[in-house]
A protein has these predicted regions:
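Hydrophobic alpha-helical transmembrane bundles of multi-pass membrane proteins
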Residues: 1-137
């Protein structure tokens, strides 16, 4: 951080990473566990997996000192979420009734709106990671 914006803004930006990362994992166990279990898993996962990896990779951690470069969460967000989702999907097994009871998409317009929001949001993640809106972002 270069000091051009308040520390609270940086904290809120980092919280967006912490919030979205467990949401990436949820797709691996959708329709197989209860919502309360998802909330409990998300909190525990943030403490046990996400925070230690952030500490080691970002902000001058020992992996950063060893030369690991993680721009916009490639390791901290995507690798940890992907490995966790794969592990959970393997542990939970197949969904019951899938693929016999497929439901067609109900609103292509809403799908496009969601894709647009995701696109703009991820651009914000990249710009925020560079702490600038320039060619680095």
């Amino acid at each position: 951080m270069n000091g051009d914006f308040p520390e609270s803004v940086w904290i809120m930006f980092q919280m967006t990473f912490a919030i979205i990362t467990p949401a990436l994992i949820v797709g691996a166990f959708v329709e197989r566990i209860k919502f309360t279990a998802v909330m409990l898993f998300s909190g525990l996962w943030l403490i046990v997996v996400y925070c230690p990896v952030c500490y080691r990779v970002w902000g001058g951690g020992w992996l950063a000192e060893a030369g690991v470069i993680d721009f916009a969460g490639g390791i901290v967000v995507h690798a940890t979420a992907g490995a966790s989702a794969l592990t959970l999907a393997w542990m939970l097994g197949r969904r019951s009734g899938f693929p016999r009871n497929l439901k067609p998409p109900h609103s292509p317009g809403m799908v496009m709106m969601g894709a647009g929001m995701l696109w703009v949001g991820w651009f914000g993640f990249n710009a925020g990671s560079a702490a600038a809106a320039n060619g680095d972002a």
